[in-house]
């Protein structure tokens, strides 16, 4: 009985092959150092919340949304059809693979471009759904040393 419970719990801890998950405080530090804290008025907590709900802190995440016909790239799941690559508008002027680097430099640069637009962070429906009106945003930085 104990062995099956332990094995079940271990199954939840195993990260799929190829995944590169950053810790919450590591993400917060990189975003802070990249100048996102209060960039265009959005707190660092908002950015960390967005990163969690978009990619679960996986900077190498690629998600193909076949229902809506787009592919999201990186920590913030930026749409290839709008923000990166050779076959779309490429508003961030970079390849989509550049958004998959764990150093997050290009990701932060592109995020700044996106949030300067008329929708702000509302450009990410996930932010509107899970972060915008959250009364627990402070938890995203709990215990983090920036």
UniProtKB/Swiss-Prot annotation:
Keyword presence, 4Fe-4S: no
GO molecular function terms attached to this record: lysozyme activity
Biological process, per Gene Ontology: fertilization; fusion of sperm to egg plasma membrane involved in single fertilization
Subcellular location: Secreted; Cytoplasmic vesicle, Secretory vesicle, Acrosome; Cell projection, Cilium, Flagellum
Domain of life: Eukaryota
Catalytic residues as annotated in Swiss-Prot or TrEMBL: 54
Disulfide linkage: 25-144, 49-131, 84-96, 92-110
InterPro entries: Glyco_hydro_22 (IPR001916), Glyco_hydro_22_CS (IPR019799), Glyco_hydro_22_lys (IPR000974), Lysozyme-like_dom_sf (IPR023346)
Chief subcellular location: secreted
SMART domains: LYZ1 (SM00263)
Matches recorded under Pfam families: Lys
Alphabetical UniProt keywords: Cell projection, Cilium, Cytoplasmic vesicle, Disulfide bond, Fertilization, Flagellum, Secreted, Signal
Signal sequence annotation: 1-19
Function noted in UniProt: May be involved in fertilization. Has no detectable bacteriolytic and lysozyme activities in vitro.
Family the entry assigns: Belongs to the glycosyl hydrolase 22 family.
Protein's name in the database: Lysozyme-like protein 4
Source organism: Homo sapiens
Gene: LYZL4
